[in-house]
Amino acid sequence: AAFGAGDVTVELTETDGSLAVSVQAQNTPVRELVLTWKAVFNGSGEVLGDTWERGYGDLEWKKEADHIGMPWYFFRHEAGKCLAFGVKVRPSAMCWWEKDGADVKLHLDVRCGTYGVELGGRKLEAAKIVMTSYALEEADTPVEVFEACRAFCSEMCDDPDCRDTVIYGGNNW
C-alpha cells in the first residue's frame, strides 16, 4: 500500500513477517512519519516499554497511560495474552510507540538533527515493524509473560552479534 501528500510517498510492504515502512520525497524535507492503528485496545492492561538511554530501575510493568513515549518496542499484558509491538533492530529512524486511548501510534523520526531529511527522490526504508500476540495459559504466570517478551525480542533481531568471548565496556559519559 502507498499513501502520498504532495511529493512525499509512504509505502508499506509486507516482507519476512514484518511491515517495511519506506518514504520517498523529491523536494520536501521529511521530519517524521506517524502511523496509527485504530481501536487496538479494549479494556485495561499493563505495559512494559524500553527507555531511550538505559534503565535506572524504572523498567517495570505499569498501568497504561496515554501519550507516554516507549522507544523501539513495548508489551501490553492483559488477561490471557501478551501483545507485542516493535521495530526490527537497526532502523533508519528514531522510533517510539505511544498509546492514545484505544489507539496505538508509531512515530518514525527521520530528521537530520533538527532538519527534515532531504531525500532528493531517494527511497528511505525507515523501519520494519513487527507485531504479535502471545496466548497465555490459564495460569497467566510471570514466567509465561517473560518468555513471550523474550521470544518477541528475538523476533526483532534477525542477526544477533553473539561473540565467543566476553565483551567489557561501560556507558559512563
Residue ranges and their predicted role:
Residues 1-173:
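Carbohydrate-recognition beta-sandwich/jelly-roll modules
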